[in-house]
Amino acid sequence: KDLRIIRDFPAEEFCQRYLDVFMLSFYLIGINIGDLLLLRPTDMVGGRIEFSRQKTKKRYSIKVEPEAQEIINRWRGKKYLLCFMDERADYRSFLKMMNKHLKEFGRVEVDKARWGKKTKTGLYPFLRSYYARDTWATLASVLDVPEDTIAAALGHGKKNVTKSYISFNMK
């Protein structure tokens, strides 16, 4: 339910990019945001994204579903798959802004008596980029995907790491 709210929320234009990257991470089996932002157009091969994870160097081949393709098409870059890195030297600045705006996204009220000052009420004040990975892992678990498969998808070698991603409150 919360994921649908995030996906369908009529966000301010500047914030939409961060919500889209969040959803794209979820659609691509919880891909790490750093790995996602560093993808190149050549990493799209035959309807799949093929890349090596930065942290582990493990190879991945992830099917690109229509929802993911729509986001990729909206934010397509030249040098990188997504345009956000075309003018940046490091993905961390984007990630920092993404996490800032994810926790703030929600209702915006404009106070005309105070020269149009905006007041933001965050819907999910604890929302961060990594929640896309957590949510993917949790939903996979709810759908009875074996924990070993979830661990492999997330690039985890140890089960205790994967368990920390899965919220058993949803089961």
Region annotations inferred by a language model:
Residues D8-F14, N99-A152:
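Short, basic (Lys/Arg/His-rich) helix/loop patches that form interaction surfaces
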Residues R4, F26, G34, L38, ...:
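Feature representing long, continuous alpha-helical segments
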Residues P10-E12, E50-Y60, M85-F94, K120-Y131, ...:
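Short, contiguous acidic/charged loop-to-helix segments that flank catalytic cores in large enzymes
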Residues T56-N73, K79-E104:
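C-terminal catalytic core of Y-nucleophile DNA break-rejoin enzymes
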Residues L28, L38-R74:
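Conserved tyrosine-mediated DNA breakage-rejoining catalytic core shared by Y-recombinases
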Residues K1-I33, L37:
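Basic, Lys/Arg- and aromatic-enriched nucleic-acid-binding interface segment
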Residues R53-K57, L154-K171:
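Catalytic-site neighborhood detector that most strongly recognizes the C-terminal catalytic loop/helix
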Residues K79, M85-D90, V110-K117, N160, ...:
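C-terminal secondary-structure termini that scaffold catalytic or DNA-interacting sites
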